């Protein structure tokens, strides 16, 4: 993408010495000629492609076409594991979503609006809390094996609602 998130990612990567190529729908570097950049070491998705509710969409269909790829950063944070991140995981490529960046941006915005400093340690604390809230535990097993019992206990321990398929159906 070539919007604001892309500009931020580009600035940070270039500050760390990266040679950045920005792809967008139009221009000489676009989604139709991704193969020209098969030597990419890092892919950053700075588009809403893959964001809820269009979770099946992916900005790149075949990550294997990038044999030098060392990491994928998807700035989408909902869902926590987008289609492109799942593809990266399947290939053993380190990957991360944009939730931590969102929290860091919120911290900076809050400081700007309030004029009060906020300790950087709050970023990790809030990120961890949000990540836990976004994750689910799914229990799968044969009838009578204890899924409901274990699920009920986990729901109490984690202070989370229990969605029992037997009760829902």
Question: PLM ranges: what are they?
Answer:
Residues 1-14, 141-143:
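Glycine-rich adenosine-cofactor-binding loop
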Residues 23-28, 166:
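N-terminal Rossmann-fold cofactor-binding loop
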Residues 27-96:
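Rossmann-like adenosine-cofactor binding region
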Residues 75-135:
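Adenosine-phosphate binding glycine-rich loop
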Residues 147:
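Conserved lysine of the Walker
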Residues 150:
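Hydrophobic positions on the alpha1 helix immediately C-terminal to the Walker A/P-loop
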Residues 160-169:
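Short beta-strand-centered segment that lines the nucleotide-binding/catalytic pocket of NTP-utilizing
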């Amino acid at each position: 993408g070539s919007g604001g998130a892309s500009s931020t990612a580009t600035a940070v990567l270039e500050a760390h010495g990266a040679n950045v190529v920005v792809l967008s729908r139009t221009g000489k570097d676009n989604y139709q000629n991704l193969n020209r950049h098969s030597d990419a070491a890092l892919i950053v998705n700075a588009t809403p492609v893959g964001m809820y509710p269009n979770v099946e969409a992916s900005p790149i269909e075949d990550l294997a076409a990038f044999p030098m790829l060392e990491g994928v950063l998807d700035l989408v944070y909902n869902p926590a594991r987008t289609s492109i991140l799942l593809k990266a995981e399947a290939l053993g490529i380190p990957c991360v979503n944009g939730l931590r960046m969102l929290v860091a941006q919120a911290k900076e915005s809050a400081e700007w609006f309030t004029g009060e400093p906020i300790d950087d340690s709050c970023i990790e604390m809030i990120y961890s809390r949000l990540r836990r809230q976004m994750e689910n535990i799914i229990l799968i097993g044969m009838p009578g094996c204890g899924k409901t019992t274990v699920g009920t206990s986990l729901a109490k321990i984690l202070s989370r609602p229990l969605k029992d398929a037997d009760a829902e159906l």
